[in-house]
Amino acid sequence: QPSISDQQVSALPYSDQIQQPLTNQVMPDIVMLQRRWMDRYEIDSLIGKVEQEWVAIKAFLNQAQIEVRHDTEMKYYIVHLKIVDFGSSCQLGQRIVEVLGIPPAHILDQAPKFFEKLPDGTWSLKKLHNILGVETGGPGGRFKDLILRMLDYDPKIQPYYALQHSFFKQETGIAGHPTYQFSANTGPAHYMTEGHLAMR
C-alpha cells in the first residue's frame, strides 16, 4: 500500500464513525488518524466533494468582494468545509484611494450604485444603507430598519426573526412561506406574522 506522510495524515478529515483499538495488525483498507480510523474508500469519496466545496467557497468570497490573503490552511475548515477564520480578510481594494488616488470621472460615472455626482461637479460616496439591498428590490429602508433592530438593546431582535426580515428576502408572498410585516417604528416589540401577534 502507498505510504502516507505525517503532513498528509494531518490534513485528512477525522471521523468518529469507525473507531477501533490500536493493534499491530496490518489493515490495508484503514488509515489511522491520531487514534481514530477512517475507511480509505470513505476518504477517497470525499476528495471530489471537498474540491467542489472549496471552489464554491472561493466563488462566494469573490462574489462578496472579500480577499483572503492568509489563513486558508485546512485546519481552518471543518467538513463539510465551513469557514471558521476570517482573521486576515480585508475588503477588496480598501486602500485603492490612498494608493492610486481618486478614480477618474468616467469610471465614477459608470458606478451610480456607489457614487453620486453633486451639483458642484464633485463626487460623493453613497451611504452604506443606500447601497446594500439594491439587488433585492430596493435599498435604504429595509437595511437600515434591520440594523436598528439589531442595535436595539431591549428588546433586541432574535436571530430567527432577523432571518425573516424583508432585507434577506428576494421575493415576498411565496406560497407556503409566512410573510412577515415590520412596522416603520425602529424599535417595536411585536411582529405581525400570518395574521397573529408574535412577541419578540
Swiss-Prot record:
Any one Gene Ontology BP term: circadian rhythm
Activity control summary: Inhibited by RANBP9.
Modified residues (Phosphoserine): S88
Enzymatic reactions: L-tyrosyl-[protein] + ATP = O-phospho-L-tyrosyl-[protein] + ADP + H(+); L-seryl-[protein] + ATP = O-phospho-L-seryl-[protein] + ADP + H(+); L-threonyl-[protein] + ATP = O-phospho-L-threonyl-[protein] + ADP + H(+); [DNA-directed RNA polymerase] + ATP = phospho-[DNA-directed RNA polymerase] + ADP + H(+)
GO molecular function, one term: protein serine/threonine/tyrosine kinase activity
Post-translational modification: Can also autophosphorylate on serine and threonine residues (in vitro). Autophosphorylated on numerous tyrosine residues.
List of residues that carry Phosphotyrosine: Y41, Y76
Residues bearing PTM Phosphothreonine: T122
GO cellular component: cytoplasm; nuclear speck; nucleus
Residues that coordinate or bind ATP: K58
Gene3D superfamilies reported in the protein's UniProt record: Transferase(Phosphotransferase) domain 1
Subcellular location per the Swiss-Prot or TrEMBL entry: Nucleus
Subunit details: Interacts with RAD54L2/ARIP4. Interacts with CRY2. Interacts with RANBP9. Interacts with WDR68. Interacts with SIRT1.
Family: Belongs to the protein kinase superfamily. CMGC Ser/Thr protein kinase family. MNB/DYRK subfamily.
Comment, domains: The polyhistidine repeats act as targeting signals to nuclear speckles. The histidine-rich domain (HRD) region is intrinsically disordered and promotes the formation of phase-separated liquid droplets that enhance its ability to phosphorylate the CTD (C-terminal domain) of the large subunit of RNA polymerase II (RNA Pol II).
Protein known as: Dual specificity tyrosine-phosphorylation-regulated kinase 1A
Species this protein is from: Oryctolagus cuniculus (Rabbit)
Gene: DYRK1A
